[in-house]
């Protein structure tokens, strides 16, 4: 587990790690799957709920008005070269899993991975589905599939990543400008789709740069109190894995099983999703297969 030739302070040290047997979804949770859950339970996600001004720790007059409206973070390409992520992320009121690009954009596509969810939303779905969010070690084991670590960008047939000069030019060699429907690219040796690219995937672990060398058997990462993210120093963030369609050689070379970052558990984004792990064999039929069988009964 881990890698030391790309972002060693984030991903090292490399060490032998053991995890108990588990099952994992073959692809990211889709909009169709999440819609079935939300419709049957009347669930409302964090991005759709009224905003509590107290969460900002400021007086209401100091908070930009748009941040007091329900919404989420959407990738918005800038019109000039930039290496500052604040130049291409925009908080869009009305953006949610149903409307990934905002209220004036298209509806979510059924077979694309669900995005714009907070940790609370993912856990609610997981409980309903009889699963759980995988640990970082489980996720990395499933993604690595026994292959030797690589540092180069995947080709356009194996993962949805950014081809071109990020964030200005996307050559779309892989056929997609943004998120792709699940299963469009070759599976890894474990038969799992989109473990690299497409959307970042959330894991259970809290984030700190680097790994604990002593964490070898079913590691769980640091405690909430010991979590530290240099990009969000006052917030315990969760580890996300695998990179997304925004990862490019000139900016974010995190299209690898060992890649990791911290993400705010309370705020969704248009390039972050998840899949579930299970301690016993689940029903891995696709939503389409399950709904067809149900209608035939």
Residue ranges of model-derived segments:
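Short capping motifs at secondary-structure boundaries
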Residues: 22, 37-46, 129-130, 281-282
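Acidic-aromatic/histidine active-site loop/patch
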Residues: 30
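Short beta-strand segments
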Residues: 13-15, 238
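Short, structured beta-strand segments at or near domain termini in extracellular proteins/domains
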Residues: 270-284
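An anion-binding catalytic pocket shared by soluble metabolic enzymes
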Residues: 25
């Amino acid at each position: 587990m881990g890698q030391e030739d790309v972002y060693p302070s984030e991903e090292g040290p490399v060490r032998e790690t053991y995890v108990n047997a588990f099952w994992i979804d073959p692809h990211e949770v889709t909009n169709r799957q999440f819609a079935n859950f939300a419709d049957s339970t009347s669930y409302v996600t964090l991005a759709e709920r009224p905003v509590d001004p107290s969460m900002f720790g400021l007086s209401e007059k100091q908070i930009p008005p748009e941040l007091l409206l329900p919404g989420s973070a959407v990738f918005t390409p800038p019109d000039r070269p930039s290496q500052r992520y604040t130049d291409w992320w925009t908080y869009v009121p009305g953006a949610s899993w149903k409307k990934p690009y905002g209220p004036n954009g298209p509806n979510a596509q059924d077979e694309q991975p669900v995005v714009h969810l907070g940790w609370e939303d993912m856990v609610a779905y997981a409980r309903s589905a009889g699963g759980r969010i995988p640990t970082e070690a489980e996720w990395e084991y499933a993604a690595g599939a026994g292959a030797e670590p690589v540092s180069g960008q995947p080709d356009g047939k194996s993962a949805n990543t950014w081809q071109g000069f990020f964030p200005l030019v996307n050559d779309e060699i892989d056929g997609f400008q943004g998120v792709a429907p699940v299963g469009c690219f070759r599976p890894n040796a474990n038969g799992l789709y989109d473990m690299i690219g497409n959307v970042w995937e959330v894991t259970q672990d809290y984030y700190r740069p680097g790994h604990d060398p002593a964490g070898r058997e079913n590691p769980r990462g640091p405690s909430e109190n010991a979590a530290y993210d240099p990009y969000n120093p006052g917030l315990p963030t969760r580890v996300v894995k695998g990179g997304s369609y925004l990862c490019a050689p000139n900016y974010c070379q995190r299209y690898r099983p060992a890649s990791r970052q911290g993400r705010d558990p309370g705020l969704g984004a248009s390039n972050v999703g998840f899949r579930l792990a299970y301690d016993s064999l689940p029903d891995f039929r696709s939503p389409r297969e399950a709904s067809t069988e149900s209608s035939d009964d």
